Amino acid sequence: MKLDYWQENFFKVNLILLILIFFLMSCSDQIEQEHDAATFNSLIEEYDFHSSKINIVIKDNIDIKGRPTTAGSLALEGNIAKDNAYLVQKLLDNNFHIAGKANLSEWANFRSYYSVSGWSSLGGQTYNIVGLDFNPCGSSSGSAVAVAVGIVDVAIGTETNGSISCPSSVNGIVGMKPTVGLVSRTGIIPISVSQDTAGPMGKNVTIVARTLEAIAGYDPKDSATAEIPQNFDFNFLENLKQSSLKGKRLGVLQSDLSDRHANDLLNKLQTILEQAGAEVVLLNDQRAYPYEDEYFLLKYEFKTGLEDYLLNATESKKTLEEIIYFNEQNAETVMPFFGQEILLESLETENLIEQYQRAIDATQKTKAETIAFLKSNKLDAFVGLTRGPAWKINYEGGDDKAMDDVPSFSMGGFAAISGLPHLTVPFFQMEQFPIGVSFIGLPWSDKRILELGAALERELTNYDGKDFIAMENTPIKSSFLIIDVRSDAEVLEGQLQDSVHIEWTQIVDSIDTVTSSKDQQIYLYCRSGGRAGRAELILKDLGYQNVENLGSIEQASNILDRKILKLAN
């Protein structure tokens, strides 16, 4: 772990709002004791990682006894978990230390069609590790960035469709979506009983496999786990070091990759796999994706699943309707950027049982076609590029609009809808952003998929191309930089959207952690302009010529057209 890197960047770049103030746990008593994180220094001094256990952070839609489980929503701010989620207890029983909770896209990105991934009304905006202008994807945003920045080696995310694979890929880490049913969902705020799963996200395949060993298994409270085959091999670590791509038959999906750079990377991947001894089969994918049926299924199951969860929760709101009402009454803080049309549509599905059955039939048909596609081509796995590069954060039109400006491709949808294991391993880069390589296999082939990922990971040592970006200590890139030079305590009262925090007295020691160019445009602000003026003179003495003092936070907000975001407290 790179604790020194975390200390340098935790508040300064506001990357993840990773461990929210009221989630902090001490190592000696990881469930009972809270810490006062009023200032950055007191947080670092008081908070220690366990020296002899595997430190891990948990996405904040998963129960930890005595801690809030919020799904990033202010509506659930007081939802204190009665018990540990099944997977959390298994982690504690297997020498893991729960270091804290990670921010996520609110309601696991299931609130609005125009949502901004990585943003939640409770936790604020999580940023991509490479650039503050860019989105970390979601919904397991904080889990991905926590690993990418080096705070922990592994985290737990959840996925309904893309919520592990996407943030893992765009932040340059390994992410594993297991076969649905391999990991219990008990104690997790749900979207869909058909597609939900939790899974590990880590710095390499080995730690991901180790974590999956710990959390996998039968849970009598989750009927999906009863589908685990009786002879299933849970020893995911067993053959990782000896695994090889030699002789493996891998199918490259020739889907619509209209982007030249994506095709170039796919061709490079084919060459690398073949040089490693794999047999690569180019597949003409004619499957039709049932978008409307899948989304209806998710909306129908969300209402039922959420209300089942709330029934036994400490949260006083027990229905989706009450959640919606709370959001409406607190729209200024809950919905400053986008609405809740998905929640409203979910509410309307309640009695549409026949349409729900049609949706089940359609998605099951797609699953059968996908499994048949793998089997008929005698494949060990599908392989391909996980998804396109990160897109810019856009609060005006959300991800939907922002993704129009970047190459858009992905291969995780069929795995999600079919409940198949999906592993992404960081390998390439595009436009300075990571691109993962995905392996997708048959149900319960999780061990084989991990072995393929470990074998590909080793190919990095033999690969002399420059298409892989190492995430650790990567300078933050942006067209311009906004620096808040106030004190730590002042920042807790609110911070300008997209700004980083460096107290003016620390500017000399810390400026090179947020920019690698003395030509970059830098804007400074504070409470009234005085400290920003002193910081401006210091930076110009250091050779930074494009520096401007914007005065107070309110003046900076008006000049730069940036909102003032209040941090969780």
List each model region and its residues:
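Short helix-loop capping/hinge segments that flank enzyme active sites or metal/cofactor-binding pockets
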Residues: 53-71, 247-251, 300-365, 424-433
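Gly/Ser-rich catalytic/binding loops embedded in alpha/beta enzyme cores
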Residues: 29-161, 179, 267, 271, ...
